[in-house]
Amino acid sequence: MRRANRLRRPAQFRRVRQTGRTFSSAWLTLTVAPGRRDGVRCGFITGRRLGKAVQRNRARRRVREAVRLLLPSLTTGYDLLFAIRSPEVIEAPFSQLQADIIRLLRQACLLTTPETEPVSPVSPTSLPQNERGSP
């Protein structure tokens, strides 16, 4: 995720937590606050109860990638804070994780395009011939 799309300073995280509106799912909590007009900035939080550093970093990387794929379809002008609540995020299929994030973003009315299914990180041409859908 590009530097311009990240919350980086503790004061930025604090402002979003204090002034934002919260949406929850079984795996994540999304806090949304008005931000800069020219884009969307995202922050990711994992607590120690999620596991040791390796597990926390892996959970953060997976959620960050799922959000990065959705950035072009998000409404600009907001700061988003994703708090990872469950260790299931680490082992869950990526498509389920992405569907959970889409559900939260829809609750917050932040998707500009109606998404019918999660964005796939794999292009259809990179799949084996027998797994490709017919045109």
From Swiss-Prot:
Catalytic activity: Endonucleolytic cleavage of RNA, removing 5'-extranucleotides from tRNA precursor
GO BP, one annotated term: tRNA 5'-leader removal
Record key words, sorted: Endonuclease, Hydrolase, Nuclease, RNA-binding, tRNA processing
KW RNA-binding (keyword) present: yes
Keyword GTP-binding recorded: no
Family annotation (SUPFAM superfamilies): Ribosomal protein S5 domain 2-like
Gene3D superfamilies associated with the record: 3.30.230.10
Cited InterPro entries: Ribosomal_Su5_D2-typ_SF (IPR020568), Ribsml_uS5_D2-typ_fold_subgr (IPR014721), RNase_P (IPR000100), RNase_P_CS (IPR020539)
Self-association state and partner proteins as the record states: Consists of a catalytic RNA component (M1 or rnpB) and a protein subunit.
Function: RNaseP catalyzes the removal of the 5'-leader sequence from pre-tRNA to produce the mature 5'-terminus. It can also cleave other RNA substrates such as 4.5S RNA. The protein component plays an auxiliary but essential role in vivo by binding to the 5'-leader sequence and broadening the substrate specificity of the ribozyme.
Family: Belongs to the RnpA family.
HAMAP family: RNase_P
Protein name: Ribonuclease P protein component
Species this chain originates from: Chloroflexus aggregans (strain MD-66 / DSM 9485)
Lineage, uppermost ranks: Bacteria, Bacillati, Chloroflexota, Chloroflexia, Chloroflexales
Gene expressing this chain: rnpA
